[in-house]
Curated annotation (Swiss-Prot):
Keywords: Cytoplasm, Methyltransferase, rRNA processing, S-adenosyl-L-methionine, Transferase
Organism per entry: Actinobacillus pleuropneumoniae serotype 5b (strain L20)
Cellular localisation: Cytoplasm
Catalytic activity: guanosine(1516) in 16S rRNA + S-adenosyl-L-methionine = N(2)-methylguanosine(1516) in 16S rRNA + S-adenosyl-L-homocysteine + H(+)
HAMAP family referenced in this protein's UniProt entry, alphabetically: 16SrRNA_methyltr_J (MF_01523)
Role played: Specifically methylates the guanosine in position 1516 of 16S rRNA.
Top class in the EC scheme: transferase
Protein family membership: Belongs to the methyltransferase superfamily. RsmJ family.
InterPro entries linked: 16SrRNA_methylTrfase_J, SAM-dependent_MTases_sf
Single GO molecular function: rRNA (guanine-N2-)-methyltransferase activity
Protein's name according to its UniProt entry: Ribosomal RNA small subunit methyltransferase J
Gene name, Swiss-Prot/TrEMBL: rsmJ
Record keyword Protease present: no
Length: 251
């Protein structure tokens, strides 16, 4: 993985801490750049500046609008994880990405442990979480309900200590559409991490960690994860949520 590391902020020490923590190495020939400004950490595709920058922002913009005016418990992901009545499952989001589905779940009351294996994406996610924790409106519930795990892969979680009611998986899958039709964020992400070609390997550790169910979000044209037929699926316009029920008893 190659990336340029650019500091446009006045805080050189913070920039170096980010690079050291995530073990990032500057490559001046890379077309992707991780940039620290005085406001945020962001990802840019230098050969396509019109795409704009990608950053994690839970405080305002699209995510704030979704929290205030979205479907809440009625959102497809909330239904898929089994939210019903007073039941708010604990969740491991094993492919956290930019944390958007996790934020929906946290906004309705679920506690979510976020796992992200790509260090650049994890750095962006952590930056967004830190800013959200400091926000007077959402900071308190964010600190309680959205936590970034210390490990980068769910296979490293302790089944005895860190199992959850639900393990949620949304692995990257190749798009059918031509790249020009794919939204800017996905185009940059595809260049950064590509498809999760080894995503079948998530299934066994996910089942081990899930007390109630494993939920896998897939494009409607994608095969079942690890060729495992789900107990049932919930479909939306372009996606489906494959649900695998667990027989583990709660401790």
């Amino acid at each position: 993985m190659t990336i340029q590391l650019i500091n446009e902020s006045s805080n050189t020490e913070k920039f170096q801490q980010i690079c050291d923590k995530w073990r990032l190495v500057h490559d001046r020939s890379a077309i992707l750049a991780l940039v620290l400004t005085d406001e945020r950490l962001e990802l840019r595709k230098l050969d396509e500046p019109k795409l704009g920058a990608i950053a994690v922002n839970f405080v305002d913009g699209t995510m704030a609008h979704r929290r205030k005016f979205g479907g809440g418990r009625g959102e497809a992901v909330a239904k898929a994880v089994g939210i019903k009545g007073d039941y708010l499952p604990t969740i491991i989001d094993a492919t956290a990405g930019l944390g958007r589905d996790a934020f929906v779940l946290a906004s309705v009351g679920c506690k979510v442990l976020l796992v992200e294996r790509n260090p650049i994406v994890a750095a962006l996610l952590e930056d967004g979480l830190v800013r959200a924790y400091a926000d007077p409106e959402i900071g308190a519930f964010m600190q309680e309900r959205m936590i970034l795990a210390d490990v980068r892969n769910i296979s490293l979680l302790d089944v005895a200590q860190q199992a959850a009611d639900v393990v949620y998986l949304d692995p990257m899958y190749p798009h059918k559409q031509k790249s020009a039709l794919v939204k800017k964020e996905m185009r940059v992400f595809q260049h950064l991490v590509g498809a999760d070609l080894d995503s079948d390997n998530f299934f066994v550790p996910a089942k081990a960690l899930a007390r109630k169910r494993v939920v896998v979000k897939r494009p409607d044209y994608a095969p079942f994860l690890a060729e495992q037929k789900p107990d049932f699926s919930q479909t939306t316009k372009n996606h489906r949520f494959d649900v695998y029920l667990s027989h583990l008893k709660s401790a």
